[in-house]
Amino acid sequence: MTAVPNRQIQLQFQSAYGFVHQDLSAVRCVSDRFLWLGCDETATLERVTIEGDIAADHKHISLTDYLDLPNETDEEVDVEGIAYSDHYLWVVGSHSLKRKKAKLDASDAENIERLARLEQEDNRYLLARIPHVEGELFKICSQPDNPEITLTAAQLEFKKSGNTLIKVLKDDPHLGAFLKADIPGKDNGFDIEGIAAYPSEEDGETRIFIGLRGPVLRGWAILLELQLEADGSDLKLTKMGPDKVRYRKHFVDLRGLGIRDLCPIGNDLLILAGPTMDLSAAIRLFCLKDIDHLDNDALLNPDAVLEIPYGQGFDKAEGITLLPDGNLLVVYDSPGSDRVNQAMTAVLADVFELSS
């Protein structure tokens, strides 16, 4: 049965940037009051502050103020995941190719030609961390709990084919064929949606989990596990475990759906799941238990938790985060008109109760 939200929170944006309300793609609550939001049509982050059922005091923040993007003009990053751990905000782009859309005002011949055109936008291959202290971002700063520790913004190195992660994955027996064939994300190609960060108890490095919207292989979604270490402003893939692998690959039974977002809940992992292709269909929340005990590549069967409401062509759930009261906040891409205020500068997000 589809869940019913127990309340809603209105996200309010500056009028100059009110457009972001229609393309929200990621969310993370930090320090119990700051909501960090991603918009998949920009190279920015949005920050609002929660007070009751309102989240306002909007800040529109350019990622180029903290990171070195290949194209620093107006090219989108396609932010698809935001995570937080140990005073770092983590941001990931979709890492996907784009196929041109058909246009209503174009001829059949023009649209057929458009559907043959693929685009690689280099900014989409962003995987980065930015120091975060009391709701503010920094390129470099002292760790507030231990001033002798320096926090630095860092990112995975960009490459001609994307970045160092894509370079490694091109040799993967499951993912390599999709990457080498240049299959766009919305065609069940490689497409990142969701990131979760956990402090590593073994060596102090942060464990990063990355969700793939696609490809889904015979009904199995894929969850990548990485460890990253910083060398100045560069992030590098750390070899993990006795086998010294640069990533782990977990196959997750989400009933044929792909991963749309990730959110830590203690030692567990919440997974928002939805269609891989561009269609309106079931959106479900799953819970993967005891993430700490994942050591090797695995087949995983998480518990189904909620059915999230969706519309036909609107209200596409894209981001989830836990609120201080333990409830789940859900933000939507292409929100329905009943969610948006008359000035087109605010949008309603849903809050769902999670049963213990």
Give, region by region, the residue ranges found by the protein language model.
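Sequence/structural signature of beta-propeller domains
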Residues: 1-356
